[in-house]
Amino acid sequence: MKRKLQNIAYLLVAAALVTSCGGKKQTSEFPDWAWADFQRPEGINPIISPDTTTFFYCPMRQDSVAWEASDTFNPAATVYDGKVVVFYRAEDNSAIGIGSRTSRLGYASSDDGLHFKRMSVPVFYPADDSQKELENPGGCEDPRVAVTEDGLYVMHYTQWNRKQARLAVATSRDLQTWEKHGPAFAKAYNGRFIDEFSKSASIVTKLIDGKQVIAKIDGKYWMYWGEKFVNVATSTDLVNWEPMLDENGEFLKVMTPRAGKFDSDLTECGPPAILTDKGILLFYNGKNKSGAEGDTLYTANSYCAGQALFDAKNPTKLIDRLDKPFYIPESDFEKSGQYPAGTVFIEGMVYFKNKWYLYYGCADSKVGVAVYDPKRPAKADPLP
């Protein structure tokens, strides 16, 4: 009996010693709709880090720049020609501070989803084109990519001219030659929202014969988008999008931050949403507030990853939502760099070789990957 009491006491002390994001793990059960057990491959991360040896002739500066010297993070991902392709946000060394450098998108491909070969120059960047006033000097940030059944790749990204952030659209057939279409909401409501702050889009997708493709619901394409809150928009052509509005004519908020939770400050959309047999599964990034309004189990201002379930027949209807994140900053490089509060910022996810590969930004500085095997039963969410 004495030994049994000692064991119980040990467990209680161990639980009390658990700290914020990145501490030892407790466990709790997931609902059956959630995709729980994303695992970090041992010895793999980070998969992409800054490189000071690569240079690119910038058409806007008309000079050679070390385009990925400072930070490489916040990746989109897709599958092309049997390989995983990641588009990562790369910042040059032109200044100091988040959002003060120029961002361009690098291209990396992989045969196994874990080891990547990078191109030496960016494939997407501010240029002397129709979008230069909206993209220069801040750049092209935080992409998400999805593909149609007939092979049209659709990228949503943030245009940043250091005055206003705008969600924009580009399309490609080969992932290297892109057509920029400009702000996603440029034509909606007679251009009312073209100068409104917007970013972070998750197009609804589905699996068809093992391929993740853009889905239609009631004859329209749908996407969740937003940073401070989650909104919904629809499109008939994947280029021009119409955000849904509430009874007051403002953006319809289908999901908002929750006081006392890990997502108490922001609920920012992540990779493409997935249409499942339970509903529409939305992966998102939750930012934790400091103080009493946040979740004291997690570091103040940290970004952790959450999941929410929406109704497949009514994509504006939130059915359920995880109370705890399914993925949190743990590794040193996820809690250092530009964002030492801790960040796992999920933006890319692909179905590849019967598993789901999740790609994320590590503290706004590097790129990591986690893998989910749907054949493996869900264990538990990581609690601090």
Annotated model-derived regions:
Residues 1-27:
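Bacterial Sec-dependent N-terminal signal peptides
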Residues 21-74, 78-138, 146-265, 274-339, ...:
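Beta-rich carbohydrate-recognition and catalytic domains
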Residues 263-269, 342-345:
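Donor nucleotide-activated moiety binding/catalytic core segment of transferases
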Residues 334-336, 344-347:
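Short glycine-rich, acidic/polar surface loops and turns
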